[in-house]
Design a protein with these regions (language model features):
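HDAC/HDAC-like amidohydrolase catalytic core signature
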Residues: 1-177
Length: 177
């Protein structure tokens, strides 16, 4: 299974961030898969067309400290984004960042990132049922317990795994081996 939601943007230019993350990697890969003579006609069998959930605050608390999650849902969010994406250099100058060119505020990134976390949760849940699922929007695995790192504000992989792990514990009634 492949989770690819074409409505989900991958770039960050609308936030004024000039880090070259291109939508084309996902869209071109998807286009090549659907153009494949064997895979294309069977796209309905392997393509999940939309991310159906967003990560929630309680999901974030499975992988991040309460203090960090509170900072993300407060006026400190913009400072966390600036630090995580290294948008100001050691001399206090903008680095790969042009706020004048932004069409959206930096703080609007959180909603987009929460949808990506939800996509990773959905992909992991799908993989449990089908044996495999690749999600074009995931992989924010550098974020730490109490801070974002390496252009990753949240650790979607750990959040998803811990959410699914908690679901397994709840459903089975005992701790699995």
């Amino acid at each position: 299974m492949i989770l690819y939601d074409p409505r989900q943007p991958h770039g960050m230019h609308e936030f004024g961030i000039q880090i070259p993350v291109m939508d084309s990697r996902a869209s071109e890969t998807y286009a090549r898969l659907t153009a494949h003579p064997e895979l294309g006609p069977r796209a309905a069998e392997w393509h999940l067309r939309e991310v159906r959930e967003a990560g929630r605050r309680e999901d974030l608390l499975r992988a991040h400290s309460c203090d960090y999650v509170q900072r993300l849902f407060s006026s400190a969010l913009e400072a966390e984004i600036v630090r995580t994406f290294e948008l100001i250099d050691v001399h206090g100058r903008y680095h790969r960042y042009d706020p004048a060119g932004a069409t959206l505020p930096l703080t609007a990134m959180l909603d987009r990132i929460l949808v990506r976390v939800g996509g990773t949760i959905q992909a992991c849940r799908t993989a449990l049922g089908s044996g495999f699922c690749f999600y074009f929007g995931g992989g924010m695995h550098h974020a730490q317990w109490d801070f974002g790192k390496g252009f990753c504000l949240l650790n979607d992989v750990v959040i998803a795994l811990r959410k699914l792990q908690a679901g397994l514990l709840t459903e089975s009634g005992h701790q699995p081996n």
